[in-house]
Amino acid sequence: MGAMRRMEAAKGAIISLLLDAYQKRNKIGMIAFRKDKAELILPFTSSVELGEKLLKDLPTGGKTPLADAFIKSYEVFDREIRKNPNIIPIMIVISDFKPNVAVKEDYVKEVFDACEKIAEKGINVILIDTEPQSFIKIGIGKEIANRFGFKYYKIEELSKDKILDICKSLEINF
């Protein structure tokens, strides 16, 4: 499956998740990471239409400022958890997990440091790895999942229904 097809499949699955969240009156947020930084493009909201539009227009490819994405995600979730301590926080990260942009110096260490804070905060994390199958594995998604207890899936393993089932199982466990 080519990179564009993999990302389109992931976007389709997330759109299904957005619709499910809307029906349950859950809130969604979106952080995009590309070029040299991550940015909050959708603060937590119930607007599925806005989330769907932003997701469809989201470009793929280029650099992967993964450390900044995890840092920003932690900050956004931390604020939301402080405002609403009874929420069940679920973070879904879709990436090839090949960090290549540092916030300061060591991008891999920065990713692990941010993930440690996320795990300590009790945020449920689902990693969806878009790195193509090959003998040479560069991405660190599986290592992140193993180290911090995050759920990990290759994009090829997932369907829209599978992602919804994963999120529903997290909600039931709390």
Curated annotation (Swiss-Prot):
Pfam families: VWA_2. InterPro entries: Mg-chelatase_DI-like, VWF_A, vWFA_dom_sf. This is Uncharacterized protein MJ0910. The lineage of its organism: Archaea, Methanobacteriati, Methanobacteriota, Methanomada group, Methanococci.
